[in-house]
């Protein structure tokens, strides 16, 4: 079930609100949310609810087991086993197809194609990357002594399966919400802020991201070698806007929904496209994922405490894992290593040059160029496609398609507005930024804007069937 669907907006969510707010008993409210979350997940993939329940049970029992141990050696063995089993589940469903494709490619190259592996493709359960990482953070935190093992399996189940952030994040760490599960308050101010945040996120998705997505997908269906330089750049820029409004829009909706039920989730985006370095970009983009990798991979590897060379290696390992987490494909791995390489280069000295540069505009141009080129790898179906698009971008080609074939005044207007709303307008006018994230809705204009946005999005849903979420693939 999608947040941006009529069923969710006008059936599921009102029903959950009604059942949730007819009682003030927190245990009953948690039961309502857990039941709703399982139903939400089962709506699209009923059989994979069992997989999620297995994950919940696995991590619950390992958490209890680790929490009762006295021997550090046994605790380490138990947490290693649990992490392995979690990654085994994730690896089987997400990376098995990719592994077989690699094996067949190697067999074809070195064995002449005489022997290849036949297999039935395994479907990817929606949200498995997100809830697996949440479960891992719980078990590791119990092992580290950061938190106590949760004895109530229903509380842990709600943490892992909570529908606002189940499908596409933010990745919530257990120690950030464990107290909220057991004790939280729902206020009128929180509800108002949550509705406003959800409405803005829905508008980002429906009015901006979907418009850009339709154009980008149409362009990707054409022979890429015949796009021409102008269209290739237009494709890259529109996808850059699409993925930001798609993913940040979903995060806004998730944060807003959580607030409506009394939960405070961490911010996942902080205007990443106004960054002046790639290092800053990753402090602003998908914050919950980057902090997860920092806390559970980069620091355990040694972080930056074991010399420069080791730091560079650790960064490349983390961004290899970041790329692989996003998708089982060479394009995602290259995208991750590409960003990791620029982070290494910035640590080697480029970062200091950027800090000393008096012309900050050049820093913005550098960062924007690196990010836009990186998104080409992320969007391309194959490395060959990415190579063709990049060739079109950096060597002048006329192409056979006029730009007017792909864009119209609506797309151009939304693209310009999208660029402004990606951080430029908020930087120029800080009050706009404060307004978007203030915790109270006290003005009539806020209510009017929310009503208009919900109406426009509903009309869009009624008239259109195009409604993909990029991060649902992960």
Pin down the residues of each PLM region.
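Membrane-embedded transmembrane alpha-helical bundles that form the catalytic cores
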Residues: 1-426, 430, 434-473
């Amino acid at each position: 079930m999608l947040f941006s669907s009529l069923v969710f907006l006008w059936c599921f969510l009102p029903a959950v609100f009604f059942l949730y707010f007819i009682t003030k008993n927190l245990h009953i409210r948690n039961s309502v949310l857990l039941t709703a979350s399982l139903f939400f997940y089962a709506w699209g993939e009923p059989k994979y609810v069992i997989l999620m329940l297995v994950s919940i049970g696995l991590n619950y029992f390992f958490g209890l087991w680790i929490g009762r141990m006295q021997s550090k050696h046994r605790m380490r063995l138990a947490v290693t086993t649990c992490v392995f089993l979690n990654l085994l589940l994730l690896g089987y469903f997400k990376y098995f197809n990719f592994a077989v494709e690699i094996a067949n490619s190697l067999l074809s190259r070195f064995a002449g194609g005489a022997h290849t592996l036949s297999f039935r493709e395994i479907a990817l359960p929606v949200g498995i990357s997100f809830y697996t990482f949440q479960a891992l953070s719980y078990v590791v935190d119990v092992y580290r002594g950061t938190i106590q093992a949760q004895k109530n399996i229903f509380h842990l189940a709600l943490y892992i399966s909570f529908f606002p952030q189940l499908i596409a994040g933010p990745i919530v760490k257990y120690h950030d919400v464990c107290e909220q599960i057991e004790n939280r308050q729902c206020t009128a101010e929180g509800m108002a802020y949550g509705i406003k945040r959800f409405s803005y996120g829905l508008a980002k998705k429906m009015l901006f991201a979907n418009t850009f997505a339709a154009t980008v997908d149409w362009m990707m269906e054409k022979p890429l070698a015949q796009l021409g330089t102008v269209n290739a750049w237009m494709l890259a820029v529109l996808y850059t806007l699409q993925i930001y409004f798609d993913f940040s829009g979903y995060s806004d909706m998730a944060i807003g929904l959580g607030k409506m039920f009394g939960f405070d989730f961490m911010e996942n985006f902080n205007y990443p496209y106004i960054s002046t370095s790639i290092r800053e970009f990753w402090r602003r983009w998908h914050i919950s994922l980057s902090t997860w990798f920092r806390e559970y991979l980069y620091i355990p590897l040694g972080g930056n405490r074991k010399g420069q060379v080791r730091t560079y290696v650790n960064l490349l390992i983390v961004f290899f894992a970041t790329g692989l987490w996003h998708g089982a494909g060479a394009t995602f791995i290259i995208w991750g290593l590409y960003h990791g390489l620029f982070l290494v280069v910035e640590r080697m000295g480029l970062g200091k040059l950027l800090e000393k540069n008096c012309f900050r505009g050049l820093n913005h141009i550098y960062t924007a160029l690196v990010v836009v080129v990186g998104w080409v790898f992320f969007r391309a179906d194959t490395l060959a496609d990415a190579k063709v698009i990049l060739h079109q971008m950096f060597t002048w080609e006329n192409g056979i398609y006029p730009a007017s074939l792909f864009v119209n005044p609506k797309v151009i207007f939304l693209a310009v507005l999208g660029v402004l709303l990606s951080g430029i307008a908020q930087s120029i006018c800080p009050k706009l930024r404060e307004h978007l994230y203030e915790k109270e809705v006290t003005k009539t204009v806020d209510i009017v804007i929310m009503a208009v946005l919900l109406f426009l999005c509903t009309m869009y849903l009624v008239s259109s069937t195009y409604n993909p979420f990029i991060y649902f693939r992960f």
